[in-house]
Structure formats: structure tokens, C-alpha cells
Amino acid sequence: MMGSFIFLLSIIISINYINSLHTVHRSNIHRNMHNGGMPKKAVAVLKSDTVNGIIYFQQNNRASATTIYGTINGLTPGLHGFHIHQYGIKANGCTSAAAHYNPFEKTHGRPTNNIKHIGDLRNIKAGADGVANVNIISNHIQLSGPLSVIGRSLVVHANPDDLGKGNGDAREESLKTGNAGSRIVCSIIGIAPST
């Protein structure tokens, strides 16, 4: 009887100790965030059967632009729509990312326009070797705060993005997706080490 009591007591003490470590870790994260700390770098690791790449997001402070850079391999040569989508991906792949990240409910457009989705980046161009070198500077992508893109998805599309300029029958879809076609590779955007 006494042995069972001591065993149970040791389990309770262990659980309390682990919970206290978790609480200290969480409070350190929150303290750093409230003291002006923020993630300065994020990463999306893109991988499918044929396409792979790593894209980094770097923002030095909340007021600075975000640089989006990296390389994607295995694309068909030419332009491809490149967007941040609303949700992180689930088991059913890129379709679970939902629509472009658009918290202000605007129509799709060119990244330099006032009317655009926050998730509208631009087209990326793959060379004849299927490699796209990405280097984008964005004033509307944030790594912290209520408009943070961390936890959302980065998606590469099969076709070029028409930047909301489609005409005729293509106009309605142009204002939603840029007629960029199917989603060929995607990744959740996660926090990366700053170094």
C-alpha cells in the first residue's frame, strides 16, 4: 500500500515539474514577444513528387519590408502563380489551404496595386532547367501581429497569374485567383531560426 502511494506521488511530482517547465518556456516566449521580440525569419519547405524547394521570409522589424527568397526546382519552364493561402495544409494537400490570404476581402490584383489580396505575391519564373530563383521584397507581408503569414501556406501554381487583368469569360476567376491554375506544390510557413 505504501509503495503504491509513493509511486503515485512520484508521478504527480513529475507531471507538476514538466508542467512548470512548459509554463516557464511559454512565459519566456510571450515576454520576448511583448518586449518587441518577433520572429525575424520564416521558412516554407516545398516538396512534391517532382517539385522541391526552400523559400525563406525575412523581416527585421515590424516596420520593415519582408524579403522572400529561395530556390524552387522541378518546375515547367515559364511563369507560375505564387501566393500565400489562408490556411496551413492538412492531409489532403494543397486544396486544404483554401483561397488566397485576403483578410480585407479585396479582389485579386498585382502586388503593387492598392486593391489586392495580402497573399498576392507575383509570378515566379522557372528557366529552361526548371529552376526558379525567388527574390521578392514585400511591404505587405508580416511575420508577426494580426496579419502574420506564419501558419498559413505558400502555394506554387501550374500557370501564370494574370494579376487580376483577365477579360471576358476569364474575368470573374481572374479577380479571385488570377487564373493561375492548379496547385502543384505547397508548404506551411513556419518560424525559422534567425541565423
Swiss-Prot record:
Keyword vocabulary terms for this entry: Antioxidant, Copper, Disulfide bond, Metal-binding, Oxidoreductase, Secreted, Signal, Zinc
Cofactor(s) needed by this chain: Cu cation; Zn(2+)
A single Gene Ontology CC term: extracellular region
EC number(s) on file: 1.15.1.1
Protein's UniProt keywords contain Nucleotide-binding: no
Cofactor: binding comment: Binds 1 copper ion per subunit. Binds 1 zinc ion per subunit.
Top-rank taxon: Eukaryota
SUPFAM superfamilies assigned: Cu,Zn superoxide dismutase-like (SSF49329)
Catalytic activity: 2 superoxide + 2 H(+) = H2O2 + O2
Residues that, per the record, bind Zn(2+): H100, H108, H117, D120
Signal sequence, renumbered to the chain: 1-38
Single GO MF annotation: superoxide dismutase activity
Disulfide bonds listed in the record: C94-C186
Binding site for Cu cation: H83, H85, H100, H157
Pfam family, one: Sod_Cu
Subcellular location, record wording: Secreted, Extracellular space
Keyword Metal-binding: yes
Its job: Destroys radicals which are normally produced within the cells and which are toxic to biological systems. May act in the parasite defense by neutralizing superoxide generated by activated leukocytes, thus acting as both an antioxidant and an anti-inflammatory factor.
Similarity comment text for this entry: Belongs to the Cu-Zn superoxide dismutase family.
Protein's name according to its UniProt entry: Extracellular superoxide dismutase [Cu-Zn]
Organism of this sequence: Dirofilaria immitis (Canine heartworm)
